[in-house]
Amino acid sequence: MATKTYTIDAAGKTIGRIASEAAKALMGKTSADYTPNILSDVKVMVNNCSKIYTRERKRQQKVYTNYSGYPGGLKKETLANLNARKGHGQAVVVAVSRMIPRNTMHTARMKNLIVNA
């Protein structure tokens, strides 16, 4: 099969709506021959991530947490800090990653996600 490219324009949309659309396409649920245990031949491109619609309150109050498993290893970061440190597309990557099931195909599916600022 030929690889299909699914393009999403992020301008004016919220992170959750973009991420759910991208996750659905990465899992292959937009094609007629969907099979849950087979990796789909879909590449998802998200464009204009710098124009994503987020409220100022969300930028200051949305907190992403990571825990290393060690004592004192809990790290917290706001959406504003994440955007400043890694770029606007990283919030979309995190949201899509958390919407895709954590199984053996998770990393392969995430490699098919291309985020452009």
State where each predicted segment sits.
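Ribosome large-subunit tunnel/peptidyl-transferase-proximal elements
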Residues: 1-94, 99-104, 109, 114-117
